[in-house]
């Protein structure tokens, strides 16, 4: 099943938690750096803290096959063509973008496979009935990611630092 490739899992330790939005965003960024290294072997020097851009927070619910569904949180980080996600924090997803050239050293206990794709390639993959995607990844992509991705090089500022939580 294809999905985002990194889950940050912020820990209840100094530096990865916060009592207000700016501190929480900073904590998510630090956790993302830690887990990018753990899961994908991306060293934090390749994904500098200050290069992460906070866009918004979301709270989502994704029904599945009628028997199972999902109602939890994912933080999602996106590079130009590498999609990375982080996980649960205060039951709200934090959406961060980072554009970086990275070297991968995959932790096979965490990640089965990776694929760099363009926006058009990802849209084509979604149409392939033989491929399966996690519900949260597809929901975020179809409702917001493609719009943001189109503005990654110019105009992304209008999407950054949202104060409201989007309900999905």
Residue ranges of each PLM-predicted region?
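Generic detector of short, locally flexible boundary/turn motifs and exposed helical patches
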Residues: 19-21, 40-43, 78-82, 88
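A short coil-to-beta-strand element that immediately follows conserved catalytic motifs
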Residues: 43-55
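Alpha-helix capping at helix-to-loop junctions
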Residues: 37-45, 60, 101
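Nudix hydrolase/Nudix homology domain
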Residues: 2, 6-7, 13, 53-168
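Conserved Nudix-box catalytic region and its N-terminal flanking loop in Nudix hydrolases
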Residues: 1-42
